[in-house]
């Protein structure tokens, strides 16, 4: 009995040491970073669902993993974190990306030209898929921010003694989490494609493929608004701070004006009260003299002697 309790106590202590070890905690936080960013997965799912070519699927996966890796490194490397959050970086990344999308969506008829142009545009489309999945990860850092990504690591990093071991284990956990996520997405899509009930209804499949781009754009817009509502963009917060400061200044000026008006009104009322108190003694003296001079009938007492 004593031996069993001793073994049980040692086993529990060993389990507690393993759970509280830096490696396990690093695996845990690295695995949680897989689910910390939401909108960045939409381009990957769109490429996996809509693109039938394997090259585009591979390029989308590569761009997604590269962008996630840059985001993961920016947590631990402060210069990269500051560089991604600067307004010049936003201008350099966002404007060319939007212009390229505008040009690409309005010039799709170039794909119908000769074989050389078709091959070049095909390679360009593969590169475009890669850049979409790469750049959108960087957009999520400051345009669609998720505070979970930075807080997951900062909670434990300042308490950890062996930071290199923690970073390595969290990177391994992050990589395992993304591999599992990609495998899960592939299994779900393969099940949908192999399902006979879905494949038999060709009208439903054609309508779904035609409206897939619109569905993903709506989902992206809703998720973006949700994230921006929870944590506003740094581009907007500066203007909001300025407007709040102007409102506070206006409120303070209004309060001072109200105080000045109230003080002036109190001074006027005090002066009126003092003036009324000065007029009251004269009235009282006149009222005291009148009863001596006037009788109840209203006559003067000197008139009484004449009458007598």
Swiss-Prot record:
Any single Pfam family the record assigns to this protein: Ycf1
Keyword Plastid applies: yes
The organism's place on the tree of life at top rank: Eukaryota
Organism: Piper cenocladum (Ant piper)
Regions of compositional bias (Acidic residues) in chain numbering: 250-262, 275-293
Its job: Involved in protein precursor import into chloroplasts. May be part of an intermediate translocation complex acting as a protein-conducting channel at the inner envelope.
Topology class, membrane: Multi-pass membrane protein
Name listed for the protein in its UniProt record: Putative protein TIC 214 N-terminal part
Gene (name only): TIC214
Region of interest (Disordered), ranges: 239-308
Nuclease in keyword set: no
Entry's Gene Ontology BP terms: protein transport
Disulfide bond sites: none
Quaternary state and interactors: Part of the Tic complex.
Places the protein is found: Plastid, Chloroplast inner membrane
GO CC term, one of those recorded: chloroplast inner membrane
Family under the similarity heading: Belongs to the TIC214 family.
UniProt keyword list: Chloroplast, Membrane, Plastid, Plastid inner membrane, Protein transport, Transmembrane, Transmembrane helix, Transport
Matches recorded under InterPro entries: TIC214
Composition bias type Basic and acidic residues, residue spans: 239-249, 264-273, 294-308
Transmembrane intervals: 18-38, 64-84, 87-107, 124-144, 172-192, 215-235
